[in-house]
A protein has these predicted regions:
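Hydrophobic targeting segments
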Residues: 5-11, 25-28, 35-40
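A conserved acidic beta->alpha catalytic loop
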Residues: 41-49
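Short, well-formed alpha-helical segments that are part of the catalytic scaffolds
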Residues: 15-31, 47
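Conserved catalytic loops of nucleotide-sugar-dependent glycosyltransferases that act on lipid-linked
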Residues: 73-74, 131-234
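Short, high-confidence coil segments that cap the C-terminus of an alpha-helix
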Residues: 85-86, 113-116, 197
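Terminal disorder- and signal-encoded targeting elements
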Residues: 1-6, 240-256
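Acceptor/aglycone-binding surface of glycosyltransferases and processive sugar-polymer synthases
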Residues: 59-60, 66, 72-76, 80, ...
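Short beta-strand-to-loop acidic/aromatic patch adjacent to the donor-nucleotide binding site
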Residues: 85-96
């Protein structure tokens, strides 16, 4: 895959550990040499000294005193960046995804055929034993099965915070995308399935960071997000018409 097309990385953040995020920005800048690293930063006022630390690390920052939500932050930022950059990559701001995996994911887009490249969490064995709780494993497995059954998403890890796409793919998906929160990932994939967007799936070396927890209320909330994603996808016209009796499925063209 060519790597000479403009790349923008987006790290949506809400009250992140500034030291860890600054180090992550520096690592991504060194490893990927992107044209832009942007942090839509919720819960902070303009002029806060923390913003300067992120800028010194190599990022541009758009602060918001309110919590607009992950989906709103990503959609708004992609809308701006997709007019100037050919490739878009988003990663969780806590640095859970390794920079090496981010390099591989970014290399999957920018070719002759526009595509969406998604990661699935692949923790190092020791890190998985240490950091990934039984609750998180059960939740992830159950959510994946529900996403498959309700929305037609066959991906290993729909909620993985590592996804890359061509800017042209973003503009195809954007009109139907409405989710402003953590269900943004699932709605994105559901719309991609309905539209027939080619998708590739790749392992991402992942270490869960302290403070990223699964609330007991999440399964009920996520079910609502899945049903919303299904409704949104049903309104998305496919690239090629399919029989009305046929359920749209996320077409994973390649798996690592």
């Amino acid at each position: 895959m060519p790597d000479d097309r403009d790349l923008a990385i987006v790290l949506p953040a809400y009250r992140p550990p500034i030291g860890r995020l600054s180090e992550y920005i520096e690592t991504l800048d060194t490893q990927l040499d992107p044209d832009r690293i942007h942090v839509p930063f919720d819960g902070i006022k303009d002029g806060d000294p923390q913003l300067r630390r992120l800028e010194q690390a190599g990022a541009t920052v758009s602060p918001s005193p309110d919590r607009q939500g992950k989906g709103a932050a990503l959609s708004g930022t992609f809308d701006r960046l997709a007019t100037s950059f050919d490739r878009l990559l988003f990663l969780d701001a806590d640095g859970s995804a390794s920079a090496e995996s981010a390099v591989h994911l970014a290399e999957q887009v920018g070719g002759s055929s526009p595509t969406l490249a998604i990661g699935y969490r692949h923790p190092p064995q020791q890190a998985e034993r240490r950091n990934r709780t039984g609750c998180r494993r059960v939740f992830s497995s159950g959510y994946r099965r529900l996403a498959h059954a309700l929305v037609g998403i066959d991906a290993r890890d729909p909620q993985c915070g590592a996804k890359a796409m061509d800017a042209s793919v973003w503009w195809q998906l954007r009109p139907a995308l409405r989710n402003t929160g953590f269900g943004w990932d699932t709605e994105l994939l559901a719309i991609a399935a309905a539209a027939g967007i080619p998708v590739s799936e790749h392992p991402v070396e992942w270490v869960d960071q302290p403070g990223t927890t699964v609330r007991l209320t999440d399964p009920v909330w996520m079910l609502g997000q899945l049903l919303s994603a299904r409704r949104r996808a049903s309104k998305t016209p496919p690239r090629q018409p399919t029989p009305s009796s046929q359920t749209s499925r996320l077409r994973v063209a390649n798996r690592d």
